[in-house]
């Protein structure tokens, strides 16, 4: 019985050492690649650009009333559809976008409070500050572009 435990411990130790050697070998091989740093920088740059585009492209020009109204209606519709499908996270994201650019957010919040289940409405309330901050940043960027 002691022999089986000792054998298992030795086997586990050997497997761990082999795994560690495998990790070290491939990490060294990857790092010694002359293009590794360039590919890593390029990958990070593309991710950063994609993230910026995803955040900025969704918001309409806040000075164009027609674009804002169209965006508002699309976001409400998408939010309702996603909530009906059970995708609460994305549905709430769209509803928060609509609330953030709405001219009368308090009235819209009252309507949503009456129509949404309480947990979904709470999720909506927790996401509002982040979307308001994002829209504020987008307005600041637009003002900086004008100057």
Swiss-Prot record:
Gene: tomm20
Organism of provenance: Xenopus tropicalis
Subunit structure: Forms part of the preprotein translocase complex of the outer mitochondrial membrane (TOM complex). Interacts with tom22.
UniProt main location, coarse: mitochondrion
Cytoplasmic side: 27-147
Name the UniProt record assigns to this protein: Mitochondrial import receptor subunit TOM20 homolog
GO-annotated biological processes: intracellular protein transport; protein targeting
Keyword list, A-Z: Membrane, Mitochondrion, Mitochondrion outer membrane, Phosphoprotein, Protein transport, Transmembrane, Transmembrane helix, Transport
GO CC list: mitochondrial outer membrane translocase complex
Cell compartment(s), UniProt: Mitochondrion outer membrane
Family in the record: Belongs to the Tom20 family.
Topology term for the membrane: Single-pass membrane protein
Source superkingdom: Eukaryota
Topology feature Mitochondrial intermembrane, residues: 1-3
Annotated TM spans: 4-26
UniProt keyword annotation of GTP-binding present: no
Keyword Heme: no
Function (record text): Central component of the receptor complex responsible for the recognition and translocation of cytosolically synthesized mitochondrial preproteins. Together with tom22 functions as the transit peptide receptor at the surface of the mitochondrion outer membrane and facilitates the movement of preproteins into the tom40 translocation pore.
